[in-house]
Amino acid sequence: MTGHYSKTEHQYILLTSESASFDHYSVYRDPQLPQIFSHNFVQLHDTFPLERLLNFLPSVPKLLDANYLHLKASPQHVFPLGLKQSLVKSGFVVEDELLYDMKLSDWKGQMGHPLTAWGTAKSLSDGSSIMKIYDSIYIGEAIAEQKLKRKYPFYEADIIILVVCYSDQAQKVPIGCGELFIDHQEKTAKIEEVAILDQFQRKGYGSILVKEMLSIAKSLGMEAAYLVAASTDGATQFYEKLTFKKYERVHTVFHYFLT
């Protein structure tokens, strides 16, 4: 990640991950949650020569102390077709992370949608419950529980604002949530972990949730907001409809070793 958002992204990652910087790359590790891939990866610097990538990859699992390989290129890196083909032929998964951003000076949304809540004991409890349910579907209940315990102190202290979406104005049934990380120094907000339960998706709840998060960010003096989406997760059109703009693309390389 480059430019304006790299400092905010680094601060967000450091909430859960240790960082070690070397000449041409940095290593991020979360010893408490080695199973969470987003907390554990090698980030290449702009100076890393791509011709060395294939020879460098075998060292990544050792750097992460993990049985998988997770690497992010620099946004300045563009993988040649031949390199992509070699990686895929060798069994690596090559995908793109897309960073979308929005300048909040033009955001006209109003905070306080009746289907959303944040900053209360009830919203914290409801949001934590939804986050655990959603994560359990994809990473298993045990790891979801560990992940929630890892992040709960940040939610409780409002270091990360947990915003909740409900099915109706009575706010009895929480159906989604999202993280809002506020970087006051950079005047930048990061939107992360947007989750709507499957049976409530494509009904407008996701839009309500993200719009509320943008309004909260602007009310807190933020000048910009951004999020990171996988090019394969189908959410890119959703964010573009909300007038987010594609800011940059990052190649990622992943491989899971069974032994």
From Swiss-Prot:
Protein name per the record: Uncharacterized N-acetyltransferase CgeE
Record-annotated N-acetyltransferase domain positions: 110-259
Broad EC category: transferase
PANTHER family: GLUCOSAMINE 6-PHOSPHATE N-ACETYLTRANSFERASE
Keywords per UniProt: Acyltransferase, Transferase
Role description: May be involved in maturation of the outermost layer of the spore.
Entry EC number(s): 2.3.1.-
Molecular-function GO terms, alphabetical: acyltransferase activity, transferring groups other than amino-acyl groups
Domain of life per record: Bacteria
Annotated source species: Bacillus subtilis (strain 168)
Entry keyword Transferase: yes
